[in-house]
């Protein structure tokens, strides 16, 4: 093993571990303030680490540590260049700096460093046209989001009379509303919320898999951090319509993301849309906390805030594991198309187990990392007594339905990804020749899988982090949250659940079934090995198996009005008769409907304007001087 990949991975893990340590100090210690005046003109760099910043710093570092270990073996297989290897730890450091920033200037600097570093990593394989297209989409979307954040925070700093977060004064309701909308657009773009998600299913599949894990499990969380820090903490507690806006954006993102994931055939694209779904659930929980607090239901508001924080931890664990497992499959086969995979359970058993753990966590079912957080969210919604408030009475049942439908569709999407991609027989020679990932890649996945199991059966271990992070929200400060332990109890709601007991019961039942099956097997005669019945055909072929496309076809048909699939059927008739078919070719593709209806017309209009500007480039110096003179006249008239 060469020194370069080892050094890059070790440095990335080291930066991640350091981030975890510093983040925990910020969460459980006093607020730490560091000011370095000479690093930036006029304002300097101002670091102020509190509980909320410490939570996100520790979470980011916890993702980076196993990804760095995974990176060592991944680089050996994929041969990343020196520039990406050097930028990965810088990307992690920039992400750690974002929640530590204590001033608007420092925050904007860290945010832009994070964006530039991630763009360089997305373009690691820039020789391919798909990568260049994804990089362009990501660059445009992230810079448009940055402009919205820049304008919003500059307006906030000017109205609040300070560049530092701690020194911001009260601002009028009009400024609060404007800053809320601008920052929701900017941070929502980074979090992949609908309709600002268009970059995510393009950039994540084309980026190297360790980078995809960092972006999807850590970077998108910082979009949520921006919403929490500025909209819900510094500007909060917000009015009722803020909560309704977050509920609407979160619910739409959750449903649209999981619908696209359920019909996606590209494994990494499926996981990218799953990120949009989970960011939507977190945003929905934050909106519920804001709405409930405005109506005086502080108990459900506190539980909803805790659900959002816990789900961020769970998503970071299972999504980093899922992208690392998908990267192992890609490195072993060169494929992301589920229709060409299969049979990996025998060839890559460890990777199969790891992806299964991640898929279970993404489903939100018992024994999965996301179960407890989604259970908390549902409990907060169904126990929010509406009283005489018609808004709460209308929105909470709808929100419960959104969470339930998103969970069901997520089960379908992850069942498809695991069953089609890893079980059955190989559908291509590449899948048949697959081999298990190297030890360092398996070690990184094992760490993330261990975190998923801990969150599934013992959320007690992260309870202090969740309590302290949730308590930073004004909506959750009126009630002390103490219900997250070995048994998750909600005293104000007469609800409880014991994930550890559920795990023990399932394990005991599985052992009992295994013992009974072994006992019955011993009493039976030895089974005979006979050819598998092929329904009258000569032999079974891989074409007779379900594919990802056929698995998703019922959902595609039910939600056709939303997904807008493009379907084409071509029938080739025999020479003897046009009533007899020799071949029937069925093609279907599901593009992003929002991208086609919203972004494609905008891109077309921009291209048309660019063509008009190109025609103005005639090469005539006299015409260029006339343009300049006209511009000067316009400036003089406007500035008069």
From Swiss-Prot:
Signal peptide, first to last residue: none
Predominant location category: membrane
Membrane protein topology class: Multi-pass membrane protein
Record key words, sorted: Cell membrane, Membrane, Oxidoreductase, Transmembrane, Transmembrane helix
One Gene Ontology cellular component annotation held by this UniProt entry: plasma membrane
PANTHER family noted in UniProt: FORMATE HYDROGENLYASE SUBUNIT 3-RELATED, HYDROGENASE-4 COMPONENT F
Protein name (database record): Uncharacterized protein MT0090
Keyword Cell wall biogenesis/degradation: no
Highest rank taxon of the organism: Bacteria
InterPro entries (UniProt xref): ComplexI-like_HydComp (IPR052175), NADH_UbQ_OxRdtase (IPR003918), ND/Mrp_TM (IPR001750)
Native organism: Mycobacterium tuberculosis (strain CDC 1551 / Oshkosh)
One Pfam family cited in the UniProt record for this chain: Proton_antipo_M
Listed GO biological process terms: ATP synthesis coupled electron transport
Family: Belongs to the complex I subunit 4 family.
Membrane-spanning segments: 8-28, 52-72, 90-110, 136-156, 179-199, 208-228, 241-261, 277-297, 298-318, 352-372, 391-411, 446-466, 497-517, 619-639
MF terms in GO: NADH dehydrogenase (ubiquinone) activity
Localization per Swiss-Prot or TrEMBL: Cell membrane
